[in-house]
């Protein structure tokens, strides 16, 4: 289809309300319109190529136009594109559920599908709450999470989140819970570490964890869940949980009979360097989390699919006679769609055939080594992350850690310079966000980090 490029730009500004975008500024600026993708690159309507340094918002795993995933979608489309999962099965959804149970911790045995991460979290919330109701424990109406946590933009997901910037305006609509202070090592309320690296070198008493445990112990009888992101707080600015934090919370949940939900929508499928963050011995011993949320990379970033996994114990509480109305009343039109599940099956096959988790380890090591060079720059306060999820926090004053005002758009100033160098990056406030695809090459890693170094120097900060 040959459409005039100027007309596309005009219609984009005239008809589309873009997410997380100040449309006044967007309508006044030159808009980037992507036409296609090749490998790790996005290509705009003018043929310009950009390294996709945020994996199209943290979902693309193996680059764009990966033939195995596209062929799987095409082959399924030749059979059937969609039939309902309400009281009726379909082949790809069954095969994928078995596969997910096989590759996640063994105590997670049941799969509930949805189309995006926020819905996966909504389902987890409903499962946890109704579990206690069916158990006869109807007094549990609160949750516990951390301030600045992010779990999606639907009402339930916003409620258990804690982002004042994103969701503050909706507070009157949200249900109530308790929010602990986040384990934000760079801006720790208990210590004055120079940066996250210094905290990791020196260690601490984990006061943030103790605060969370105290909250769980104090409110256990009124709480139906504790929910955390898997190893790193993504939208808060790529803030890693200190080693042992999540395991400590899981232990407290087990000791106080509180369901623990781990949101790995963003962190699952290799992002933190492991297939899943919850794939560690301590959590396996505790048989936690009770509920696991997956999404984003589940289809390689090609189609919208998410999944909520849980245990036999939780699932069994929902079993009964039809008239008892114990069933989980949740489900959307495209739940368990065949095209989506086929894309996910092809994605998981790539993980197996190409030994992806083992092969990305040297690239992750190189990535973090190259990023350390940024710390010498005047306005780089902190470089932090896990695996291929990294945040670089820009500050007005490195000694005092004074942040730039939100409206100064420090991160976007760097993003504009990167775009000139053929790299697409979307920041969050003053934090440069890097979430490259797992398929990024060593050469591309070095170019990305070198270009970022220069972009920060060139930006008007």
From Swiss-Prot:
Keywords on record = Aminotransferase, Biotin biosynthesis, Cytoplasm, Pyridoxal phosphate, S-adenosyl-L-methionine, Transferase
For this protein, the record's InterPro entries field holds: Aminotrans_3, Aminotrans_3_PPA_site, BioA, PyrdxlP-dep_Trfase, PyrdxlP-dep_Trfase_major, PyrdxlP-dep_Trfase_small
Q: In which pathway does it act?
A: Cofactor biosynthesis; biotin biosynthesis; 7,8-diaminononanoate from 8-amino-7-oxononanoate (SAM route): step 1/1
Q: Which domain of life is it from?
A: Archaea
Where does it live in the cell? Cytoplasm
Residues that hold pyridoxal 5'-phosphate according to the record: 117-118, 263
EC nos = 2.6.1.62
Any Pfam family: Aminotran_3
Please tell me where substrate binds in this chain: 150, 296, 331, 426
> Which family does the UniProt entry place this protein in?
Belongs to the class-III pyridoxal-phosphate-dependent aminotransferase family. BioA subfamily.
- Role this protein plays: Catalyzes the transfer of the alpha-amino group from S-adenosyl-L-methionine (SAM) to 7-keto-8-aminopelargonic acid (KAPA) to form 7,8-diaminopelargonic acid (DAPA). It is the only aminotransferase known to utilize SAM as an amino donor.
This one is known as: Adenosylmethionine-8-amino-7-oxononanoate aminotransferase
Q: Which organism is it from?
A: Methanocaldococcus jannaschii (strain ATCC 43067 / DSM 2661 / JAL-1 / JCM 10045 / NBRC 100440) (Methanococcus jannaschii)
